[in-house]
């Protein structure tokens, strides 16, 4: 008796907990104070059910290593100048190699200890004396550093994309790594997919570079920039007509400052010209660096470069303190807002490439829900009627367990934050089928024992004992297969695997435990003499 009461109490508690987790999903207005102490998360619907956009992005992590090699080449130049080591040139070559050209062998003996001490992430590859007496030294980024930078690029890319989407205002986005260098992004209910793609994919590499001096217009037209400089496109906007044009400008290769010091970026309005611009705030370190840069380059042009395009190149009139700067250019209000978002969220450490893009309209999602629900209802009614007709009162017990099974599956989806997709509904339907199969196994075993002349209680115990192992074996092996799909599958496959896993776990509880509690109550508490199975 005591054991039966505890088992019955457990069933009631599980039922109440399941209902509590489903209340936010099916009740539009929660009671006052509910959210303070009780669950408030609804069942999340996948893109195929509510519409939205599905993206698979590939982080070009090799480019992050290449950028690291470029920075190391610039740092080498600074270190050589500081140590007064003469060099002809230092350039990044290939993917992440650095070529150092020295006037002679004397400098070669000097740079070995310097590289080993101050640049542990670089590895010495070779040193060759050229016919004219110069020495070419080849360095490369160390393998461990390559691996570290690649992993960091993917992790930072994931976090940066998540920050951008959070500021974009999409509710319940799904952003997670997939494989070694890919990121899965699902944006349910998004209204402007194209804008989202641009926002996610913008690298947002902000750089401050000096405009090269003494470069003739002929050099720019010919596309030949002097050594140590590079030609960049520059955007212009006519203040009166708002017409956009593009020209070219030559900048020094060296980046004086990047966007890593930005703490805030917000859109401001230029009242005089009725145009939008982006105001930047730097952290303490960035403020000092920007002040130092402007102090050392008064009367020179400082170009503001975003993703390889120059937006403005004002002349520095005086030292600029206070840690503030502005980006003006050919911005619409929306472009300025999006630029502020990506600058606040931080630059992507490497470009991202869209490998897969799918968009599902909300009307198609609603149609999928209606068809999925209709199919489930029709299948459920057919199953319920069959169990009632074939197993009579036993069918009633099985149908109650079936209803609890579905309730627990949906409650589990809400409790663990899983996303319900159209294949997920198929997984629930399969779960219902396996739940019925479990009850059929138990009932047929009980029928066999009753035919042998056993009492209802003895037949019940033997039937459950013999069927339980078979049911556990079938469900556990299927759960293992579902977990494999969950681990290695993508998109629809994962949605199917999630509901199947949760459903099978609920199935074992309802088919083996709940129905047994009901029959034990009837046989022990109500003392019935026959079983209607």
From Swiss-Prot:
GO biological process: intracellular protein transmembrane transport; protein targeting; protein transport by the Sec complex
Pfam families noted in UniProt: SecD_1st, SecD_SecF_C, SecDF_P1_head
Any one GO CC term of the record: plasma membrane
The keyword Protein transport belongs to this UniProt entry's keyword annotation: yes
Subcellular location: Cell inner membrane
Keywords on record: Cell inner membrane, Cell membrane, Membrane, Protein transport, Translocation, Transmembrane, Transmembrane helix, Transport
Presence of keyword Protein transport: yes
Bilayer-crossing regions: 8-28, 377-397, 400-420, 422-442, 469-489, 495-515
Main location: membrane
Membrane topology: Multi-pass membrane protein
Molecular function GO labels: protein-transporting ATPase activity
InterPro entries: SecD, SecD/SecF_arch_bac, SecD_1st, SecD_SecF_C, SecD_SecF_C_bact, SecDF_P1_head
Self-association and partners: Forms a complex with SecF. Part of the essential Sec protein translocation apparatus which comprises SecA, SecYEG and auxiliary proteins SecDF-YajC and YidC.
Purpose of the protein: Part of the Sec protein translocase complex. Interacts with the SecYEG preprotein conducting channel. SecDF uses the proton motive force (PMF) to complete protein translocation after the ATP-dependent function of SecA.
Family label: Belongs to the SecD/SecF family. SecD subfamily.
NCBIfam families associated with the record: 2A0604s01, secD
Protein's name according to its UniProt entry: Protein translocase subunit SecD
Organism ancestry: Bacteria, Pseudomonadati, Thermodesulfobacteriota, Syntrophobacteria, Syntrophobacterales
The gene coding this protein: secD
């Amino acid at each position: 008796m005591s054991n039966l009461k505890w088992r019955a109490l457990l069933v009631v508690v599980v039922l109440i907990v399941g209902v509590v987790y489903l209340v936010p999903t099916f009740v539009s207005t929660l009671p006052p104070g509910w959210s303070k102490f009780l669950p408030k998360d609804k069942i999340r619907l996948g893109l195929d059910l509510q519409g939205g956009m599905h993206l698979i992005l590939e982080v070009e992590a090799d480019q992050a290593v290449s950028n690291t090699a470029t920075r190391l080449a610039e740092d080498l130049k600074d270190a050589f100048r500081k140590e007064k080591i003469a060099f002809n040139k230092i350039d990044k070559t290939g993917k992440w190699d650095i070529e150092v050209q020295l006037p002679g062998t004397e400098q070669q003996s000097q740079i070995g200890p310097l590289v080993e001490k101050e640049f542990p992430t670089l590895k010495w590859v070779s040193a060759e004396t050229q016919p004219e007496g110069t020495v070419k030294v080849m360095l490369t980024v160390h393998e461990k550093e390559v691996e570290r930078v690649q992993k960091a690029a993917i992790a930072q890319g994931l976090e940066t994309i998540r920050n951008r989407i959070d500021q974009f205002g999409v509710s319940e986005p799904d952003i997670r790594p997939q494989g070694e260098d890919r990121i899965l992004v699902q944006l349910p209910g998004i209204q402007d997919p194209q804008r989202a793609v641009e926002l996610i994919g913008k690298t947002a590499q902000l750089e401050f570079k000096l405009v090269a001096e003494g470069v003739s217009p002929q050099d720019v037209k010919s596309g030949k920039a002097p050594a140590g400089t590079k030609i960049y496109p520059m955007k212009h906007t006519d203040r009166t007509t708002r017409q956009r044009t593009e020209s070219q400008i030559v900048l020094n290769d060296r980046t004086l400052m990047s966007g890593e010091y930005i703490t805030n970026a917000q859109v401001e309005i230029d009242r005089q010209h009725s145009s939008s611009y982006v105001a930047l705030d730097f952290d303490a370190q960035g403020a000092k660096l920007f002040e130092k840069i402007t102090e050392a380059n008064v009367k020179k042009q400082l170009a503001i470069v975003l993703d390889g395009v120059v937006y403005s190149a004002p002349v520095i009139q005086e030292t600029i303190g206070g840690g503030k700067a502005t980006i003006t250019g050919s911005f619409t209000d929306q472009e300025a807002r999006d630029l502020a978002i990506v600058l606040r969220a931080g630059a992507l450490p490497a470009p991202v490439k869209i490998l897969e893009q799918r968009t599902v309209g909300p009307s198609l999602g609603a149609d999928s829900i209606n068809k999925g629900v209709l199919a489930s209802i029709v299948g459920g009614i057919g199953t319920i009627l069959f169990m009632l007709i074939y197993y009579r009162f036993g069918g009633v017990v099985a149908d109650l367990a079936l209803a609890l099974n579905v309730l627990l599956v949906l409650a589990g989806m809400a409790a663990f934050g899983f996303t319900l997709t159209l294949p997920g509904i198929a997984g629930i339907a399969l779960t219902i089928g396996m739940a019925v199969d479990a009850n059929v196994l138990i009932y047929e075993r009980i029928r066999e024992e009753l035919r042998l002349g056993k009492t209802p209680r003895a037949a019940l115990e033997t039937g459950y004992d013999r069927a339980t192992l078979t049911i556990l074996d079938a469900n556990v092996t299927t759960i293992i297969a579902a977990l494999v799909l969950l681990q290695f599958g993508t998109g629809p496959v994962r949605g199917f695997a999630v509901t199947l896993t949760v459903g099978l776990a609920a199935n074992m509880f309802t088919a083996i435990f709940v129905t047994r509690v009901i029959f034990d109550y009837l046989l022990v508490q109500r003392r019935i003499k026959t079983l209607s199975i």
